[in-house]
UniProtKB/Swiss-Prot annotation:
One of its GO terms (molecular function) is 6-phosphogluconolactonase activity. It comes from Erwinia tasmaniensis (strain DSM 17950 / CFBP 7177 / CIP 109463 / NCPPB 4357 / Et1/99). Its EC number is 3.1.1.31. Catalyzes the hydrolysis of 6-phosphogluconolactone to 6-phosphogluconate. SUPFAM superfamilies: Nitrous oxide reductase, N-terminal domain. This is 6-phosphogluconolactonase. GO terms for biological process: glucose metabolic process; pentose-phosphate shunt, oxidative branch.
Length: 330
């Protein structure tokens, strides 16, 4: 399996491209100077483009990915607000950008050439909008509004238009602050990490109504410092889930029940200082975490049984790394 890891470092305005081998070792392929503070990133479903959000000139930049995983800037388009999170629909026709500061989510079309265009739609009133997450069926967009303790639910049509569902939202606990999400491969359950209380909620998304079925504390009992969760990801086989907390500088390891409805904490892995983002490779064997204050990334081996993390190596990147994405080239 040929994989490339991309890391975004906004303080030095750089993207680093790393080759990930089958033993979990990284080799630096390329350092790209980005046109601004690069933060959120996503790989297109066809694996041929990397879309990134940059500040302070708010725009989405498209990089073409060559056969080795190297990047070449191919085009850009304006955004209506500061990009906090970026994602695509499952068919690679639309880009969704959540903006925390501008309290909105926008829809950007992707042309047949893979390049972004002018925004098609901007949905406002999403206070603290922190991500936009399309389900595996490519039908419902889940948009956490952190400051409102809710996740807004939108239907996506073939033209890229978002319309509030009959069930327009689900609520989290007061003060939880929903942030990022992950979906179980069986398409029946979703998981959201809450920034302000470092909890993880489990949602049954299999029926017409989205229902919360569990909420789990992601920090050890007795943790008394400020809670500040950031990211969440699931292994491709749906057996293990991970979340990170920036104050604790740890990654919480969960096992997932067979049907996906229940989480159990398996352990806590100390990691790079202030882990803002991490990701899991396509084989489900490795996790790569970025330390926003350590200016390093660290690679871990995922154990097959409980999902525990074994540190392999750490690598210096740019300043203030915030985002990690992994592309499978073959």
């Amino acid at each position: 399996m040929k994989q490339v890891v991309y890391t975004a470092s906004p303080e030095s305005q750089q993207i680093h491209a790393w080759q990930l081998n089958n033993e979990g070792a990284l080799t630096l392929l390329q350092v790209v100077d980005a046109p601004g503070q690069v933060q959120p990133m996503v790989v297109s479903p066809d694996k041929s483009f990397l879309y990134v959000g940059v500040r302070p000139d708010f725009r989405v930049v498209a990089y073409q990915i060559d056969a080795e995983g190297k990047l070449k800037e191919a085009g850009h388009a304006p955004l209506p607000g500061s990009p906090t999170h970026i994602s695509t629909d499952r068919q690679g026709r639309f880009i969704f950008v959540g903006s925390y500061n501008d309290a909105c989510v926008s829809v950007t079309p992707i042309g047949e050439n893979g390049l972004p265009g002018e925004p098609l739609q901007v949905v406002k009133g999403l206070e603290g909008c922190h991500s936009a997450n399309i389900d595996l069926n490519n039908q419902t967009l889940f948009v956490p509004a952190l400051k409102q303790d809710r996740i807004a639910l939108f239907s996506l049509d073939k033209q890229g238009k978002l319309t509030p569902r009959a069930q327009a939202e689900v609520k989290t606990r007061s003060g939880a602050g929903p942030r990022h999400m992950a979906f179980h491969p069986n398409q029946r359950y979703a998981y959201s990490v809450n920034e302000l209380d470092s909890s993880v909620d489990v949602w049954d998304i299999s029926g017409d109504e989205v229902k919360k079925v569990q909420s789990v504390d992601a920090l050890p009992e007795g943790f008394s410092d400020t809670r500040w969760a950031a990211d969440i990801h699931i292994t491709p086989d749906g057996r293990h889930l991970y979340s990170c907390d920036r104050t604790a500088s740890n990654i919480t390891i969960f096992s997932i029940s067979a049907e996906g409805s229940s989480l159990k904490v398996e352990g806590y892995q100390p990691t790079e200082t202030q882990p803002r983002g991490f990701n899991i490779d396509h084989s489900g064997q490795y996790l790569v975490a970025a330390g926003q204050k350590s200016h390093h990334i660290e690679v871990y081996k995922i154990s097959a049984d409980r999902g525990l993390l074994q540190p392999l190596a750490r690598y210096a990147v740019g300043q203030g790394p915030m985002w990690v994405v992994i592309n499978k080239l073959d």
